[in-house]
């Protein structure tokens, strides 16, 4: 036997042992009705060509591996950024298990959320009873300061009235009448997680701000970070920069502590987050800035309605984007950008110059959320790199127009193509027919790396197969330095692998790069 009590093997080496190889081969032969190997090989090779690419890109009724998630996931993430807030998803239990596992696998932290556990009867007769019982249990068991309600497909298809259900639950004593239960409709069959995030944040702000008098506090700023798998590192880095500038600010939806709790013997179901007191006071801010435009369109519109100035960015990382963000903050707050931050900027510029010979002319395929793809394309062009494929499954026509304008602004973007609404199976065809040097995305890109040989750089949610990336920033000048290092490490690692064969390629296996 390949293992015993004295020799325990991990699954990776275990399944490579002869006994398991034989078992898997027999299983395939006897139970999987396999096609002849030659036919499989021919089809595989056909799928790499231009003829298949045209068929692949013409798909309309089938989606294969979309680079997005559903609205309620964004709503659950949004709720995690507020003080002692329990996310309550009106729908089936299985859906909520998906949101929790997705967040837990990325952040390596518990992700708390509950559901109304709707089943077949609720799908027919409505989920009012589930809502009443669920809110009562949530309030009694988990001691939240706020319960944020969102929805799944089931509740939206039958048209459950969240506002009416919540009021009924309060009248029946499930929660006290004054208890805060904001809500948002987040149907999973349209939009994506960024829309769910936007709707939930808007719903929470509307809950606390509607009907309240506003007294503007000059120079104060609200920051909405957006759905960000790197929120732990990014939020803390931006807070550090704003503190160095002496800015009076409030982070609206800050999940950095919730998804980075310490191991000190105390379990924290809730940790950190924007306090309800700060949330109420945020109405009086002079301006609200969003770090991700496509994550906050509804929210910023509401902020303008209450009288605030607004501005939106596209995931401010790199030189130009960080410059624009800090200058906007400086203009609103009246605070100068201190010398400490100017030095950080200079160090990033110096690092980019030091490594220019390795970065210039590198080609990239970038996929992910619209703001992230925009930001990464802008950053690689700053380094002399060339984006060739920019893909966002949840990208809109407006995003495509913005991307086209960005890419046209630099000679490094002239050969780029923008792909809104396409999925990762389409990207596979693009990588085979128009190969690039590097692929930037999330863990789902590892199958593209396996098939096409394009090195994957994991820089976006979700990252399941690597640990702790989210603890370090991508935004700001310090984040840009880490991003630069990550790209360079991937380039050098590949070069080392390609030049390590003794007496064949090792004349370029250099100690100094």
Swiss-Prot record:
| Cofactor(s) annotated in UniProt | [8Fe-7S] cluster
The reaction(s) this protein catalyses: N2 + 8 reduced [2Fe-2S]-[ferredoxin] + 16 ATP + 16 H2O = H2 + 8 oxidized [2Fe-2S]-[ferredoxin] + 2 NH4(+) + 16 ADP + 16 phosphate + 6 H(+)
Task: Write out the entry's keywords from A to Z.
Answer: ATP-binding, Iron, Iron-sulfur, Metal-binding, Nitrogen fixation, Nucleotide-binding, Oxidoreductase, Plasmid
**GO cellular component entries:** molybdenum-iron nitrogenase complex
Q: Which GO terms describe its biological process?
A: nitrogen fixation
Indicate whether Iron-sulfur appears among the record's keywords: yes
Positions bound to [8Fe-7S] cluster: 70, 95, 153
Q: How is the cofactor bound?
A: Binds 1 [8Fe-7S] cluster per heterodimer.
Cell division among the record's keywords? no
List the SUPFAM superfamilies hit by this protein, alphabetically.
Helical backbone' metal receptor (SSF53807)
Q: Which InterPro entries match?
A: ChlB/BchB/BchZ, Nase/OxRdtase_comp1, Nase_comp1_CS, Nase_Mo-Fe_CF_bsu, Nase_Mo-Fe_CF_bsu_N
EC number from the UniProt entry: 1.18.6.1
Which molecular function GO terms apply here?
A: ATP binding; iron-sulfur cluster binding; metal ion binding; nitrogenase activity
The record's misc note reads: Ala-188 is present instead of the usual Ser that would serve as a ligand for the 8Fe-7S cluster in the oxidized state.
Tell me how this protein assembles.
Answer: Tetramer of two alpha and two beta chains. Forms complex with the iron protein (nitrogenase component 2).
| Family the entry assigns | Belongs to the NifD/NifK/NifE/NifN family.
Q: What does this protein do?
A: This molybdenum-iron protein is part of the nitrogenase complex that catalyzes the key enzymatic reactions in nitrogen fixation.
What name does this protein carry? Nitrogenase molybdenum-iron protein beta chain
């Amino acid at each position: 036997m390949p293992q015993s009590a004295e020799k325990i093997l991990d699954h990776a080496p275990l399944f490579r042992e002869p006994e398991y190889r034989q078992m898997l081969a027999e299983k395939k032969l006897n139970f999987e009705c396999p096609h002849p190997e030659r036919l499989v090989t021919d089809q595989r090779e056909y799928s790499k060509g231009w003829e298949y690419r045209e068929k692949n890109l013409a798909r309309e009724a089938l989606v294969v591996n979309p680079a997005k998630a559903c609205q309620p996931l964004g709503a659950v993430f949004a709720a995690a950024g507020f003080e002692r807030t329990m996310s309550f998803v009106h729908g089936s239990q299985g859906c909520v298990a998906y949101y929790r596992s997705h967040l837990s696998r990325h952040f390596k932290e518990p992700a708390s959320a509950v559901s109304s556990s709707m089943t077949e009867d609720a799908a027919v007769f409505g989920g009012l009873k589930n809502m009443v019982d669920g809110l009562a249990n949530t309030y009694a068991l988990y001691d939240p300061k706020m319960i944020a309600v969102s929805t799944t497909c089931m509740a939206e298809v039958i048209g459950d009235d969240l506002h009416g259900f919540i009021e009924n639950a309060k009248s029946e004593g499930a929660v006290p009448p004054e208890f805060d239960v904001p809500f948002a409709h987040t149907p999973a069959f349209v939009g994506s997680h960024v829309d769910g995030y936007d709707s939930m944040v808007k719903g929470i702000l509307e809950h606390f701000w509607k009907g309240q008098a506003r007294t503007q506090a000059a120079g104060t700023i609200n920051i909405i970070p957006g759905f960000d798998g790197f929120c732990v590192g990014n939020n803390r880095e931006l807070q550090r920069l704003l503190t160095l500038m002496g800015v009076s600010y409030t982070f609206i939806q800050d999940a950095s502590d919730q998804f980075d709790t310490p191991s000190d013997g105390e379990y924290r179901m809730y940790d950190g987050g924007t306090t309800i007191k700060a949330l109420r006071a945020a109405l009086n801010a002079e301006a609200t800035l969003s770090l991700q435009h496509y994550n906050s369109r509804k929210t910023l519109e509401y902020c303008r309605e209450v009288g605030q100035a607004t501005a939106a960015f596209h995931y401010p990382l790199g030189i130009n984007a960080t410059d624009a963000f800090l200058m906007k903050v400086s203009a609103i707050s009246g605070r100068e950008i201190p010398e400490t931050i100017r030095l950080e900027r200079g160090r990033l510029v110096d690092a980019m110059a030091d490594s220019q010979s390795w970065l210039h002319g590198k080609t990239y395929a970038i996929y992910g959320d619209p703001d992230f793809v925009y930001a990464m394309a802008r950053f690689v062009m700053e380094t002399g790199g060339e984006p060739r494929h920019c893909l966002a499954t949840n990208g809109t026509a407006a995003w495509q127009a913005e991307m086209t304008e960005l890419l046209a602004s630099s000679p490094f973007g002239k050969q780029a193509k923008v792909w809104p609404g396409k999925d990762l199976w389409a990207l596979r065809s693009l990588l085979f027919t128009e190969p690039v040097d590097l692929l930037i995305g999330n863990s789902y890109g590892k199958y593209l790396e396996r098939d096409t040989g394009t090195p994957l750089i994991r820089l976006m949610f979700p990252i399941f197969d690597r640990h702790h990336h989210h603890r370090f920033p991508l935004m700001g000048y310090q984040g840009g330095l880490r991003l630069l290092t990550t790209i360079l490490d991937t380039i050098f690692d590949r070069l080392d692998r390609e030049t390590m064969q003794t007496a064949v390629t090792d004349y370029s296996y250099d100690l100094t790069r």
